[in-house]
Amino acid sequence: MTGAKRKKKSMLWSKMHTPQCEDIIQWCRRRLPILDWAPHYNLKENLLPDTVSGIMLAVQQVTQGLAFAVLSSVHPVFGLYGSLFPAIIYAIFGMGHHVATGTFALTSLISANAVERIVPQNMQNLTTQSNTSVLGLSDFEMQRIHVAAAVSFLGGVIQVAMFVLQLGSATFVVTEPVISAMTTGAATHVVTSQVKYLLGMKMPYISGPLGFFYIYAYVFENIKSVRLEALLLSLLSIVVLVLVKELNEQFKRKIKVVLPVDLVLIIAASFACYCTNMENTYGLEVVGHIPQGIPSPRAPPMNILSAVITEAFGVALVGYVASLALAQGSAKKFKYSIDDNQEFLAHGLSNIVSSFFFCIPSAAAMGRTAGLYSTGAKTQVACLISCIFVLIVIYAIGPLLYWLPMCVLASIIVVGLKGMLIQFRDLKKYWNVDKIDWGIWVSTYVFTICFAANVGLLFGVVCTIAIVIGRFPRAMTVSIKNMKEMEFKVKTEMDSETLQQVKIISINNPLVFLNAKKFYTDLMNMIQKENACNQPLDDISKCEQNTLLNSLSNGNCNEEASQSCPNEKCYLILDCSGFTFFDYSGVSMLVEVYMDCKGRSVDVLLAHCTASLIKAMTYYGNLDSEKPIFFESVSAAISHIHSNKNLSKLSDHSEV
């Protein structure tokens, strides 16, 4: 009998722990998102916009690949490889439909520190200059790309390790002000690194703490060595790029295909340099020989991994944070969801696999992602199509870029960073919404400028956590509860029909980046629970019971509810008397709740609001001033609802 029980228990245990076919399929779809969206790809609707976007993206990938490779202190051809392989890997494993992965200015700048430290410029004279190595490049160039590939490999390993540890759920501590300040500071560093090319100067590599200021000190000390030809060509290139891009932005609704000014400028500058022999006549530095084809894969040198661990951590964190911000932005814009942990895996594998093909560290770039928005891309097919055109450049067009002046390439980098640099304008909104966030932005930017992007990011996160820890003990409670007593208090004064369509929620906790998402989830869960449990079916019709629930839930019941009860008006009153403080993320989530409910025909009224909260919400959300939404008390809000009900009834009778 005991043996039979053991056998039965063993069979039950093995059945519970044996993976079913459906579980394996579900796991594959979760870890390979391409299996989820590719079978449902609509060729008729999506292929044309994805193709157009892919062609435009390829232009950006090629130009930025060449430029960011130089920024990473390696030969430009390796930037072309970095524009190809990471995009393919991310299209398979990534969840962002509009995220363009490839070379990235910030990760290139970080990896350049390792390249210049381990293989400095003065080693060029000590290594053989023969072209017998891979791709026909010198041993010096190959040593440099080996270091950059090692940074990419180790950075990818760190990202995959963070995926295994499920650290994606901890990324909420990296707030929007910290990301904005870090990327703006890093973009300022990138512009500074291009000054020597813009001015045509010969300058030693300068890095380390306060290196930003040492570069400008060197420029002013050697101002006489500036090449006027390079300066004029740089200014002309920047003016042309800015003007044409602004015109493209102004007329993008009228013209379906914008002018690829980066590509036109590269062709024109290369042709002019070739015809006038600027390299020898004026001493302009050019890109030089671009090898054809893709070399056989080779593992990065493992013996130098310990020497690049600092840069690898910087690449892993900075690249992931910047990419995740873009992925979350696109998901919010186009109404889909992403998994923060899956993004760790996607970017980690992009860096690991690409490092075997002589690629520099990769991440998503703001300019390329914005380009996908503007050209109407639908899916990652646009990125895969761009890879086809990058391959054409690698195998056919690459050698024609020999005569491209470096000052023109630097101009393309500087103008391409415009989206990051104009984030200085965020200072105004942070000042108006929350001055502490303004202080975090400024201090994070200063630390990034004085040290590096990874140091600035770390400082911003630590500073944010310290401030929240210091503020949270002052909060009275961290719970959200239904304010039933207020319902009973006003029930004798107002008719029951009014109260059936009103839900009163009391928020008795601070609303900051730590709990903004949970606030939204708890709010919706509470509304669903209260509508499901607390309203008796025999007292209220089924339509009345579910109207507010259907309006606020994310299910597919909205149309049905609106059809069955077209004249019902629902109200949600948020009692904000428990607000002790808030930040930019909290105000953003509160405005999002207001907008979501408004889109579902639910009026949101806020009671007991402080003057600072009213000012912040009005400034952030551009709220409709014609309808009052802020009230001194919950009773005042309910009285407002009751008067509106009476007015609507009077208007209905008058129409009859």
From Swiss-Prot:
It comes from the Eukaryota. The keyword Cell inner membrane does not apply. Induction: Up-regulated by hyperosmolarity and down-regulated by acidic pH. It is a multi-pass membrane protein. PROSITE patterns: STAS. GO terms for molecular function: bicarbonate transmembrane transporter activity; chloride channel activity; chloride transmembrane transporter activity; chloride:bicarbonate antiporter activity; oxalate transmembrane transporter activity; sulfate transmembrane transporter activity. It is found in: Basolateral cell membrane; Recycling endosome membrane; Apical cell membrane; Lateral cell membrane. One of its GO terms (biological process) is chloride transmembrane transport. This is Anion exchange transporter. It comes from Homo sapiens (Human).
